[in-house]
Amino acid sequence: MITISLCMIVKNEEEVLARCLDSVADLMDEIIIVDTGSTDATKEIAARYTDKIYDFKWTGSFSDARNYSFSLATQEYIYAPDADEVLDEENRAHFRKLKEVLLPEIEIVQMKYRTVTEYNTVLNIANEYRPKLFKRLREFTWVDPIHETVRIEPVVYDSDIEILHKPTGMHSKRDFGVFERLVRNSGELSPKLFKMYIRELYLTGDKTDLSNAEDYLMHLSDTTMDVDVKKSVDSVLLKNYRLNGREYDFLKTFAKAIVNEPCAETCYEAGLFYMSKEDYAEASLWLYNAANETECLIDIHSSGDKALENLINCYMKMGEGYEDLIAVASQKLKDWKLPEESVII
């Protein structure tokens, strides 16, 4: 049976920490808690489960804190949960079985990740695989009988364990602060972080968050970029202009965005814009396109339930004669659901 160190970084998690640790503590051989500046009872709660509680001065980087927590581990594998995650009884049993049978060559175990509250800022699927269990010390091996080389890709196992993500609020404001600092300091983001920033801005950004990002996004919009990236940036700018009442900038950007085939988010923003003007006929055209004729790039809901709900509202506002269209859209809304899962690492 393998041994596991739980390594968790925390800050002000008194509301959820005990719930998380109650679900996993007996599965762990070591529990390490790294606190980045709690002002509530987080550390006192953690002390009920372990004496390995360490303070870490916040650097503005979650990776720095996680790397420090990993450096303290002493067991064969490291499990890295967040405080708002939980294992139910079925998945506790799966985890216990995994400890018993995991092959020593496995270096990363992925687990299904399902958000079960409304506070889902980045997922366009019901659940996804995420790397959660890591071999602490990696052994390098040679491969191929001739022209041999060292294997650098990790050996990854996709388990049947499902982690329940149960946040009690949005983390977007915290995340936006990190993104904005990175942009100020370096002027750019990695492709992965850029994608996450765009998605969080579009899904949860308010007027201030969107305004803060405008200069950065305008700079990107003026550069040569992939077509889909350009569409994503324009969609966020459209939301910014719509929420901040900048009609001229909205229409100017929208006119350019529809020269090529628009994405669902662009059509959805147009629908909301015309709804705000009480032009429900025009709004319905763009919402229909969002729900039926275009592909989403950022937010699957913009081509799914949100587009359909607003489309139905437009038809209802337009009065008699739209009963059949309402029925069709209502049935499609009833049938709509998030895709179940995809595999990422």
Where are these regions (language model features)?
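Acidic helix N-cap motif at the loop->helix transition within catalytic regions
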Residues: 15-18, 40-49, 90
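A conserved acidic beta->alpha catalytic loop
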Residues: 23, 35-45, 58, 82
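Short aromatic/hydrophobic "clamp" motif used to bind/position activated sugar donors
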Residues: 78
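Catalytic-site signature of metal-activated, phosphate-bearing donor transferases
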Residues: 64-70, 81, 87-212
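Conserved donor nucleotide-binding strand/loop of the catalytic core
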Residues: 44-68, 72
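Short, well-formed alpha-helical segments that are part of the catalytic scaffolds
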Residues: 7-27
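Cell-envelope/extracellular polymer assembly enzymes that use nucleotide-activated donors
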Residues: 3-5, 30
